[in-house]
């Protein structure tokens, strides 16, 4: 499974490390991802999705049922 948030679609991006002498070496910026269980009241079961910290805030704001309708990947 690739490293991306199933709610917001955040993925890892590439960039540069910069030393004091401004030498550039490639690196990846990884999203803050967690596997989290959410209770679906309509189905009376938990689902487990990979979600970023911002994705959890979106779910808290909009509700899990609204977010499931617009998932980047089906659960």
Swiss-Prot record:
Record-linked NCBIfam families: L28
Keyword match Protein transport: no
Gene: rpmB
PANTHER family: 39S RIBOSOMAL PROTEIN L28, MITOCHONDRIAL, LARGE RIBOSOMAL SUBUNIT PROTEIN BL28M
Family: Belongs to the bacterial ribosomal protein bL28 family.
Organism lineage string: Bacteria, Pseudomonadati, Pseudomonadota, Gammaproteobacteria, Candidatus Palibaumannia
Entry protein name: Large ribosomal subunit protein bL28
Recorded GO CC terms: cytosolic large ribosomal subunit
Record's keyword annotation contains Ribonucleoprotein: yes
One Pfam family this sequence matches: Ribosomal_L28
A molecular function GO annotation: structural constituent of ribosome
InterPro entries membership: Ribosomal_bL28, Ribosomal_bL28/bL31-like_sf, Ribosomal_bL28_bact-type, Ribosomal_bL28_sf
One of the GO BP terms on file: translation
UniProt KW keywords: Ribonucleoprotein, Ribosomal protein
């Amino acid at each position: 499974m690739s490293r991306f948030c199933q709610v917001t679609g955040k993925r890892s991006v590439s960039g540069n490390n910069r030393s004091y002498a401004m030498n550039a070496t490639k690196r990846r910026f990884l999203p803050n991802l967690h596997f989290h269980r959410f209770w679906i009241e309509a189905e009376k079961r938990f689902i487990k999705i990979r979600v970023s910290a911002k994705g959890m805030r979106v779910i808290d704001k909009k509700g899990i049922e609204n977010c499931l309708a617009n998932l980047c990947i089906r659960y």
